[in-house]
Swiss-Prot record:
Protein name: Probable dual-specificity RNA methyltransferase RlmN
UniProt xrefs under PROSITE patterns: RADICAL_SAM
Catalytic activity: adenosine(2503) in 23S rRNA + 2 reduced [2Fe-2S]-[ferredoxin] + 2 S-adenosyl-L-methionine = 2-methyladenosine(2503) in 23S rRNA + 5'-deoxyadenosine + L-methionine + 2 oxidized [2Fe-2S]-[ferredoxin] + S-adenosyl-L-homocysteine; adenosine(37) in tRNA + 2 reduced [2Fe-2S]-[ferredoxin] + 2 S-adenosyl-L-methionine = 2-methyladenosine(37) in tRNA + 5'-deoxyadenosine + L-methionine + 2 oxidized [2Fe-2S]-[ferredoxin] + S-adenosyl-L-homocysteine
Main location: cytoplasm
Record-annotated active site: 93, 337
InterPro entries the UniProt entry points to: Aldolase_TIM, Methyltransferase_A, RlmN_N, RNA_MTrfase_RlmN, rRNA_lsu_MTrfase_RlmN/Cfr, rSAM
Record's cofactor remark: Binds 1 [4Fe-4S] cluster. The cluster is coordinated with 3 cysteines and an exchangeable S-adenosyl-L-methionine.
Species: Synechococcus sp. (strain JA-3-3Ab)
One GO cellular component term noted in the UniProt record for this chain: cytoplasm
Domain of life assignment: Bacteria
Pfam family for this entry, one: Radical_SAM
GO MF entry, a single one: rRNA (adenine(2503)-C2-)-methyltransferase activity
Length: 356
């Protein structure tokens, strides 16, 4: 028997049909496997009861590509955070965020993150490696399995910078759409901005939402918060965003984490409105998503008072900027990106398998 496409998770319907034929099976076995992989969420080929028993036994050593849940924490608002252990022992986080009408998954794209944003728990842990296709898809299947309902929305806002793993992330977006059945317009990719990558993304013919993490209205402050911003001037980033919106026809969401006394003053709101004016005047559609900070032990930043948040909103609206405030979920369960992994490693008496 020839080697299968490994891992199986991440393979397209056509590839699975071809593989089944290579194994001497009818092509419809590949269709069945596709259904069991992406819609039933199997963790072992032994679960595919529609396969002949002899073939199941021959396939028993073939890994599907699922990760192990090593920790699950549910917050009072129903948000569930998962710590997943990959085949090499690395640890990543994913979050399931339910509401009455939707189930959103916040997925990671890297183990750690090289961007080193100084208010972010993931940025404090350093960078280990890019995630593989099956490791991204597995996060969505894990949440579906746990909640017992279909995932409707996916946001690439977990650990890592998606555009530094761009090819695999775009593969994952297409698979989420074609294999799992999540509409591209229900998928959001968040980036702090990587030179030349937003223009590249604009050429990929996707219908996703792009969320750009600004976090500051001027270059000096942005470099203090996001060291990598030194290599991507704010004016150039905004220009690339404007071109992306005009090319794709899709609205961009500008993410802005409010840090008490750091970037939440009235002058910052006015600077932000002025910064975005150059994009909106060109006919581009944009939206600002304000995120009151979720404090972490590794950084000395605080959450702003609600009255400060309300004033920031008022000033942006006064300058005709569309704005909303994100409802922060999972505050009681270390739901900020990177917190669960960090606390788990600190509490572990020995390193996770595969780690030095």
């Amino acid at each position: 028997m020839s080697a299968p496409p490994l891992p199986l998770l991440g393979q397209s319907l056509a590839a699975l049909k071809d593989w089944a034929v290579e194994q001497g099976q009818p092509a419809y076995r590949g269709q069945q496997l596709h259904t069991w992989l992406y819609h039933k969420g199997i963790r072992s080929l032994q679960e595919v009861t529609v396969f002949p028993k002899a073939w199941r036994e021959a396939l028993q050593e073939y890994p599907v590509g699922r990760s192990q849940v090593v920790q699950r924490i549910e917050s009072r608002d129903g948000t569930v955070k998962f710590l997943l252990q990959l085949a090499d022992g690395e640890l990543i986080e994913t979050v399931g965020i339910p509401t009455a009408r939707r189930l959103t998954v916040c997925v990671s794209s890297q183990v750690g993150c090289p961007m080193a944003c100084n208010f972010c728990a993931t940025g404090k842990m350093g960078y280990r490696r890019n995630l593989k296709l099956h490791e991204i898809l597995d996060q969505v299947l894990t949440v579906q399995e746990d909640f017992g309902r279909r995932v409707s929305h996916v946001v690439f806002m977990g650990m890592g910078e998606p555009l530094l793993n761009r090819d695999t992330v775009v593969q994952a977006i297409r698979s989420l759409n074609q294999d799992i059945g999540i509409g591209q317009r229900h998928i959001t990719l968040s980036t702090v901005g990587v030179p030349r990558q937003i223009p590249w993304l604009a050429q990929q013919d996707l219908q996703i939402t792009l969320a750009v993490s600004l976090h500051a209205p001027n270059q000096e402050l942005r470099q203090q918060l996001i060291p990598s911003a030194a290599h991507y001037p704010l004016d150039a980033l905004i220009q690339d965003c404007r071109d992306y919106m005009l090319c794709s026809g899709r609205r961009i969401s500008f993410e802005y984490t409010l840090l008490a006394g750091v970037n939440d003053l009235p002058i910052h709101a006015r600077q932000l409105a002025h910064l975005l004016r150059q994009a909106s005047q060109a006919g581009a559609r944009l939206h600002v998503n304000l995120i009151p900070y979720n404090p972490i032990a590794e950084a000395d930043y605080q959450r702003p008072h609600p009255t400060r948040v309300a004033e920031f909103v008022r000033l942006l609206e006064e300058h005709h900027v569309q704005v909303s405030v994100r409802q922060t979920r999972g505050l009681d369960s270390n739901a900020a990106c990177g917190q669960l992994r960090g606390s788990f490693l600190r509490a572990s008496p020995e390193p996770a398998p595969g780690r030095s």
